Every structure is written in C-alpha cells, then in structure tokens.
C-alpha cells in the first residue's frame, strides 16, 4: 500500500540520532517533511516580516513598487508583480502565469522600500538562514553525503528568501478554468523551508507529488515544511528525492477566502557549485546546458531570465 502522508520530524531528535531509518526512507522516497524544534521565530515573528510585505503589496504606489524591481534579469530581488512570472513557461508545461506576487531578498544587491521593511526582513532572513543550514546538515549527514568543499563551506552559501502572496483568484482563474495557480516544479536548492498561512476558507492550495499523485500539504502549526532540492539530490548522488510540487487553484465554490501567503527560504549553493550535466539528467532534472559540467549560476540564471520573458510577453 502506498503511504501518501507527509511525515513530521523533530530537529532536536534528529540531532540526537533518533528516527534515522525513517528519516532516510522519507528523504529517498518523498523528499518532503514537516519539521518541529527548528528554533525558528514564533508565529508573531513570521507575521512581522509577512505583514509588512503584504501591506506593501496592497498599499505601495506603482512608483514605489517600480523603485524596488531589480534591473538584473539573472537574480531575484525586490518586488515582482501579480502574474509577472510563469513557472509553467520554464518547466514547459504551459503558458499560464503564476497567480501571485512576491518580494525577494538575498545576501547582497537587495532593494527595500523603507528602513522598517529592511530591518524586519534582515532579522527574519538571518534566522531562516541559520535554521536552513542546520536542517541541510541533518539531511545530508543522514545519507552520508559529504560535499567536496566540506560541509561548513558548502552551507556558507547564497540563499534566497521569497514571500509569495496568492490573492483570491478571479473567476477566470478558478480550477474549472485553470487548475493551477503555479505549475509543478522541483526546487533548485539544497533544502527549502516554507512557512505558509492557510486559506481562510480551509482550501489547501499547496500540493506535493508522492508516488505519482499530488497530495495536500496544509499548514501545520508549530512546524515548517521542508522540501529537499535538486542540489541535495546531486550532492547525495540520487539518495535524496527532490519532489515536484504545485499550487492548486480553488474551485468556484472556494474562490472567496482563498488568499494565502508562503514564506519560502531557498538554501542555495554558491554560484560556482559545479555538477555533472549527464548525472543531473539521469536524476530526472531538465538541464538543457550543452556541456558535460555546469555551475549552479549556469543552471539558475537561465531559469530566471526565461520566467520573466514569458510573463512579460503574455
């Protein structure tokens, strides 16, 4: 019988070496789990970073938003407007846009609309970074993976924090018209930590593929959601799964009250991380780079350009 549940682990227990067999099985077969005991901010701290961003989405002027849109096409920084991106385009699964808007920051080249915004996000970023490094260490160590540069150097990297706001969908984006708010994809990260807020009407929008079927992954109080990314798969030589996931659209009967947010922290390697292109393809990743080896910058830079080109041309 297929087990389609997403398990929950406690970080303190994993540090003590408990539940390792179950954890390795989860990493190999699912690549997704809830995690408690991370030491991440309490809900009020998550809310401070989230609410200041959503307030900017709702009340920032067009000029203010334009001022914090990055001119660099190969990175994600600052504001990205509603339907300005298309995950479907870069995954070759359609032409529809992501029905969301977002704000992103990294370790450099950031754009902030105010000093208050900057302070809230820098504090939040630092806490999420520390937690994601701890989680990644447990994930890689559990399967015996050792990065070529050493664990500490590998995890001293180039992460990205992105707050996505999914407003209520309009009538032409309900599930009967377009089933997804965001297309299926795997993450280009080592691990991804997600703190999501539920839809007010109870609809579960985030779903992950388990054994060929998509299952709901609702917000779980007191826990973050962890996706293992494609980089973890490569470092572990296939011993860790990078699961596909998508964001489903509500049906017409669930349209009202379907807004939600997702605070997503991508622990990504440094841009010079090098990998085998043929091995990446063997692991199921769509890498079109015409070379035997490539860097992470090669891989992700093209994705960022393509995600914007299509949306702008829609």
From Swiss-Prot:
Q: Alphabetically, which GO biological process terms does the record hold? A: antibiotic biosynthetic process
Known pathway: Antibiotic biosynthesis; cephalosporin C biosynthesis
Alphabetical UniProt keywords: Antibiotic biosynthesis, Iron, Oxidoreductase, Vitamin C
Q: Any idea of its EC number?
A: 1.14.20.1
Q: Where is the signal peptide?
A: none
State the InterPro entries in the record. DIOX_N (IPR026992), IPNS-like_FE2OG_OXY (IPR044861), IPNS-like_sf (IPR027443), Iron_ascorbate_oxido_reductase (IPR050231), Oxoglu/Fe-dep_dioxygenase_dom (IPR005123)
- Domain of life the protein comes from: Bacteria
Query: What cofactor requirement does the entry state?
Result: Fe cation; L-ascorbate
One GO molecular-function annotation for this sequence?
L-ascorbic acid binding
Q: Which Gene3D superfamilies match?
A: B-lactam Antibiotic, Isopenicillin N Synthase, Chain
User: Start and end of every Fe2OG dioxygenase domain?
Assistant: 156-269
Checking Pfam families in the record gives: 2OG-FeII_Oxy (PF03171), DIOX_N (PF14226)
Instruction: Please give the catalytic activity noted in the UniProt record.
Output: penicillin N + 2-oxoglutarate + O2 = deacetoxycephalosporin C + succinate + CO2 + H2O
Describe its function: Catalyzes the step from penicillin N to deacetoxy-cephalosporin C.
Q: What protein family does this chain belong to?
A: Belongs to the iron/ascorbate-dependent oxidoreductase family.
Q: List the protein's name.
A: Deacetoxycephalosporin C synthase
Q: Which organism is it from?
A: Amycolatopsis lactamdurans (Nocardia lactamdurans)
Q: Which gene encodes it?
A: cefE
